[in-house]
């Protein structure tokens, strides 16, 4: 196996078990809770997911921060010293400045120190477990003996084939994060509107349709995955949830019965969870290429 370290970040929502299975590492983003800085921890060591989502439900002020330069250095430098090349699969540049920080502030300095090594900082144009799925597929290619250039090129050529469909329980947290206007959130909550989000071909998250009520929103998620999923590509399917385990189980049962898919349920972590709030749920797969653009009316 080639000496390649595959990194992603806190936005990828890959569990401890999955990261160990595929030998994937990650760099930490951060959250700030009522002024107190904390790591955006996918292992849930410093706080449990129920505690995190409880903070949001209590109305505590939570915001997110991107990966810092020291965090990159502390993780990348030891790998380079050991002779590894690095592929960093990053959260969409439309949602985080982490990939830009890596490309402009971290990579040049480290390549001066380690001129024989290679570092790829790849904008996944995605987030949450669809970003994580890209890292998994990269790890499979590494295990198959592909070179760092081959793995990185495959990711660049195929990253738009990773799809997600997501919905939220309330529009309040999207409003707090500045994603929608206050009036839309107010009237949407009153009407029971559940927006269905995807990531477009430029890495923007946008609403493709609106469902009335929880049952209809779950149906839209399932239908979206059915349309996008391509079983012949042989990738995992994930269901992400933030205090929505019962709905995640419902989707899992439907996917097993209707598509014979054994989907894995995972927590939606602190980065996406802060923006979307308790009750967020999403499905993720490798499938058809994303060709939509925000505002294209399709």
Language model regions located:
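Mixed-charge interfacial surface used for oligomerization/domain docking
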Residues: 3, 11-19, 24-25, 30-32, ...
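N-terminal glycine-rich anion-binding loop in soluble enzyme alpha/beta folds
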Residues: 5-65, 71
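Short catalytic-loop micro-motif centered on adjacent basic/acidic residues
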Residues: 6, 63, 88, 121, ...
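Acidic/glycine-enriched edge-of-secondary-structure segments
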Residues: 53-69, 201-216
């Amino acid at each position: 196996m080639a000496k390649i370290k595959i990194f992603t970040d806190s936005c990828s929502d890959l569990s401890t078990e999955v990261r160990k299975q595929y030998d994937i590492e990650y760099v930490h983003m951060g959250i700030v809770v009522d002024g107190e800085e904390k790591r955006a921890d996918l292992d849930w060591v410093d706080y449990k997911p129920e505690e995190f989502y409880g903070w949001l439900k209590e109305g505590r002020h939570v915001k997110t921060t991107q990966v810092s330069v020291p965090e990159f250095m502390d993780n990348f430098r030891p790998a380079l010293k050991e002779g590894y090349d690095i592929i960093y699969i990053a959260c969409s540049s439309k949602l985080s400045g982490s990939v830009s920080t890596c490309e402009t502030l971290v990579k040049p300095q480290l390549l001066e120190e380690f001129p024989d090594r290679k570092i790829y900082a790849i904008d996944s144009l995605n987030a949450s477990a669809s970003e994580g799925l890209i890292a998994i597929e990269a790890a499979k290619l590494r295990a198959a003996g592909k070179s760092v250039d081959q793995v990185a090129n495959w990711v660049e050529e195929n990253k738009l084939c990773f799809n997600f469909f997501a919905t939220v329980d309330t529009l309040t947290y999207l409003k707090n994060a500045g994603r929608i206007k206050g009036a839309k959130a107010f009237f949407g909550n009153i009407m029971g509107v559940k927006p269905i989000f995807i990531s477009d071909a430029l890495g923007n998250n946008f609403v493709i349709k609106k469902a009335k009520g929880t049952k209809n929103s779950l149906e839209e998620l399932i239908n979206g995955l059915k349309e996008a999923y391509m079983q012949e590509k042989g990738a995992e399917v994930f269901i992400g949830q933030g205090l929505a385990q019962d709905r995640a189980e419902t989707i899992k049962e439907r996917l097993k019965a209707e598509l014979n898919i054994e989907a894995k349920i995972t927590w939606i972590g602190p980065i996406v969870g802060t923006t979307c709030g308790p009750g967020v749920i999403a499905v993720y797969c490798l499938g058809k290429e994303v060709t939509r653009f925000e505002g294209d009316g399709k």
